[in-house]
């Protein structure tokens, strides 16, 4: 298990004036997208146990209902509809061989959902699509070659010479890792404009209940579908580009002795999920050391003085870290709001939260 800390400044705040340096990477636009279909978390247990033909598992259903009620998630957007599940019944059992079916759907749908977010980011950026020099695509949903980056290049009509990088199976750490990677690419390629796209669809992890695997119920409750995109570059052109955030620094740390705490494993039945009960506590116990290393060069040690874009892996993680750091209730407000409205969006989650932070800041003129 690893943590990534990225130091950002907003371009309208006083702290931006303090740290802004020519040549630093800046986020120039953000776009997000979700499937039109969505589920209400309060009624989802009824749907889930009905569509998987598991209504006879009454105790298990009540357990799932309690998990959903405690999740602090209001709704989630899902590509999976009742019609799609009825056409593909192998997705509704727990361990039936179904990887081919899942892959066939994901290979097509992941780039399409990514395109929606990318087009929104490109529109906000306001520059010709031909000026995009790099494409980084990230997903935990499916694996193929040519990859989703190649398919998105064709869907968007990017230059055939665009420099592409495909990132598969990076999990929840991927959102912050994409910020780090985009910063490195932008600052190493002066004048370049990097399109970063994170697109996640949970078809690979959806399956019927298992009496032996409680982790599966958590996965069915927690994850949602969505895509997010951003344009990153250095030295914005006056009157042509409007920077939103500046990427000051980024660091990644492996937490010792956590190899088995959080795992996604690809099997013939799809992607299986394991999350140790210790994850919230372990993250809370280790996060401050990471923060100290990241912010000490800038003389910052008051964690309530900074704005937070915290990946909300789950409500218990948010609560535990907030308590451990002594944060005020508003510090994680954007993270909690995204978790409530979309669930855990894996790699796309951090960019959704960035978008939420900038929208709230603009609304409040902060």
Curated annotation (Swiss-Prot):
Catalytic activity: (E)-4-coumaroyl-CoA + 3 malonyl-CoA + 3 H(+) = 2',4,4',6'-tetrahydroxychalcone + 3 CO2 + 4 CoA
Enzyme Commission identifier(s): 2.3.1.74
Family annotation (Gene3D superfamilies): 3.40.47.10
Top-rank taxon: Eukaryota
Active site as annotated: 172
Pathway: Secondary metabolite biosynthesis; flavonoid biosynthesis
PROSITE patterns: CHALCONE_SYNTH
A Pfam family per the record: Chal_sti_synt_C
One annotated GO biological process: flavonoid biosynthetic process
Keywords recorded for this protein, A-Z: Acyltransferase, Flavonoid biosynthesis, Transferase
A GO molecular-function descriptor: naringenin-chalcone synthase activity
PANTHER family: CHALCONE SYNTHASE (PTHR11877:SF104), HYDROXYMETHYLGLUTARYL-COA SYNTHASE (PTHR11877)
The family this protein is said to belong to: Belongs to the thiolase-like superfamily. Chalcone/stilbene synthases family.
Function: The primary product of this enzyme is 4,2',4',6'-tetrahydroxychalcone (also termed naringenin-chalcone or chalcone) which can under specific conditions spontaneously isomerize into naringenin.
Name of this protein: Chalcone synthase B
Source species of the chain: Ipomoea triloba
